[in-house]
Amino acid sequence: MGAHVWGPAFLRDELLPNFQLRGWSGDWYAGFPAMHFYMFLPYLAIVAVDLLLPYGVAFKLVAVAGVALMPAAAWFLARLSRWPFPLPALSAVAGFLFVFDFNFTIYGGNIASTLAGEFAFSIGLACTLVYLGLVYRAIEVNELRTLASVALAVVALCHLVTLIFAIAGTVLMVLAAGIHRIPKLLGVSKAWLLFSSFAVAEIVLWRLLDQPFATLMVALFFVLGLLCLEFRGAFRALTVGLLGGALSAFWVVPFYLRRDYLNDMGWEKLTELRENLFFPAELSGAGSRISITWLLALAGFGAVAGLFRWERSIIFLVALSSCLAIAFAQWPQDRIWNARLLPFWYLSLYLLAGWGFWYLFQAACSQLRAGRSAAPGTHKGRLVIYAAPIVALGIALAGTSLYLGTSPGGSYDADNDFRWGPLSVSAEDRNFVSGWAEWNFSGYENRAASETFNDLIQTMKKVGKDHGCGRALWEYDKDELGSYGTPMAPMLLPYWTEGCIGSMEGLYFESSQTVPFHFLMQSELSSSPSRPMRDLPYSSLNIPQGISHMKMSGVRYYLAYSDEAVSESKVFSEDLKVIAQSGPWTVFLVQDSSIVQGLAYEPLVSEGSFLGKRSWIDPAVNWFNDQSRWLIPIADDGPDGWSRVSVEEVDDLSSPLRFGNQSSRKLEPLKITEVSISNEVISFRVDEVGIPVVVKTSYFPNWSVSGADGPFRITPNWMVVIPSENKVELRYGRTSVENFGLIVTILGTLILVALKRHEKRRKVVVCSSKDTKV
């Protein structure tokens, strides 16, 4: 989580003073659209708390808010959904157990994922539970529609994956209401015949006949029938969804319409279905995991008993968990990782387990009443019922503290196993989140190598002052960087140097299509690179090619750590000049590296269509790795006078596309002066017009130019302009996409205010009517 402190600070210092919630930052990836593809609302909350508390404290409080409020959010869902007492309290216990679950660490929702940086997901999930409670009331009794719409907008502005869960939950809530109604309309026997026929038809079509389209059509027909049966509730849910979408449109619409410029990291689909869904303890890999047999048993009992009683809330939870399991198994290899669905699956199991515990407790109470020790309605009977959440909480606290190794009176043996009376937990199975939290929140200053990291920061501040501000590419070494607190520590160079020294690597890997080219460079310039992006043609340490790529990318400083990288870099003293030494780090100045540069050859325009995902990245990667192609860049668009080049398929899994070969016109040398670069404005002067100039800043459609034609995207992911005047200025700003989203939000806000006033008037009329009857 160490580098996440950059985001709220950038929002506070750069965006909000300019009345913006999104903008451009040159701090990472040679520039990227800040807050355009990453939800800003949790960051805005940090900025708000920072008005009263120190920044570090504000960050920590908001970061843990999602998991801290999860039990209350689960209680809120159950309470508003009118689950019988003591289910709201038991749901809070279920939420407590969910956040302490440590079978997954980066998927989102629990404490472990929050500590890995997924705190926006946790906040979004807690808000989703609140929203589902509100939308239940809106569907059922037409109350709280405006609040439900606002809650849905909040979910959207926290995390889009939780928004998908919220929408799916809303649809299933309406369908559950329809399913619950069928036995009353058709009778129990006919209802079961209908459900059985549907299930058999789906299984036969899907499994035996392998007809996915027919399977989908039958399911769609069944769903439409249920929606018609519950038309009033469906209409209310639709109005909530439309209004919530309108309120968040100022951010969601630009995200959606600019999605083609997202970077696809290629997270590999999880295919171990049985292990991930039911037996996580059998998964291989690092990290502690525990069996969830008890959870499956309780959830299964709750599901069976609830369906036998035809409990509407159980129908909803069973439908939700079933759809999540099927979606996890059938989700394609796509930008949205199927692992992101697992937290919702686990949460639905915990909520079902709360029902299962209650049914078991009811059975125990029935036995007591049969023995006349606690008759219904008596003081003893009420005490037994009220004891259910207390007993559940006691068991949850005892189990959680046992696995955390914090049980009162417990001790560690010689093997570092924790023992508490007759119970014990091995060191391998212990819950690690307490140690991780202490590591995360104790600060960089409390790390063993804090002096080394601080010296590096001070060195780079001085380098910026003496040699000028610019981008830095640092060698990756997990162990060395991890000793500073996190391998992401140098990402904060722009944070500590007030934007003077940018870092080529940052967070938000999906936010810029420059990311793959950075990791290709990192692999060339590191002895132990990270290589987090899949399906790229990485090379091992290759300093000469790395130097060329740094110059191609406008990198000003190279920070080398390993003996191999340092010694090889010193061989190329004409290109890399040693300017500073900081502990184990050698700082090189990359000679003749500029961000604005005239081109030697006229660009070629690709004839390919770039419709998102890797349609641009794959051929651009092939160009990036082929030194013979570097002199002639490829653009995605350009004037009619530029020659065209095709996109060809090649037999290479990592880069299956490449640009064709084509000659180009040599250009006259160009003199560029008065270069000025800030976050959202780049300006320069040229001595000749009509000669293309490359600006080595990540391309994004929100850039516009005055005094030139363009900008067009050019390989690998920069901008090219054709000056029509001697003075050229590029500016990042709003476009029609952002304006459209903002207009929709303004209209949605006006509708929200009108609906709220209408609800108030209706309440007044109802109250007056009741008074008249009295």
Where are these regions (language model features)?
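Extracytoplasmic/secreted cell-surface and envelope-processing proteins
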Residues: F165-A166, F255, L481-G485, V566-V571, ...
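Membrane-embedded transmembrane-helix bundle of lipid-linked glycan/lipid transferases
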Residues: M1-W439, G443, D455, T459-C469, ...
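Extracytoplasmic/lumenal acceptor-recognition loop(s) of multi-pass membrane glycoenzymes
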Residues: L152, C323-L324, A396-R447, K461-K551, ...
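Solvent-exposed loop/turn segments at secondary-structure junctions
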Residues: F100, V161, K478-G482, Y558, ...
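A mature extracytoplasmic/lumenal domain signature
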Residues: T162, Y476-K478, S562-E564, D592, ...
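Short acidic, glycine/proline-enriched helix-loop-strand junctions
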Residues: A565-S593
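Short, hydrophobic beta-strand segments that form beta-sheet elements in well-ordered domains
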Residues: L473, R556-Y561, V693, R713
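Active-site-proximal, structured, solvent-exposed surfaces of multi-pass membrane proteins
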Residues: S643-S768
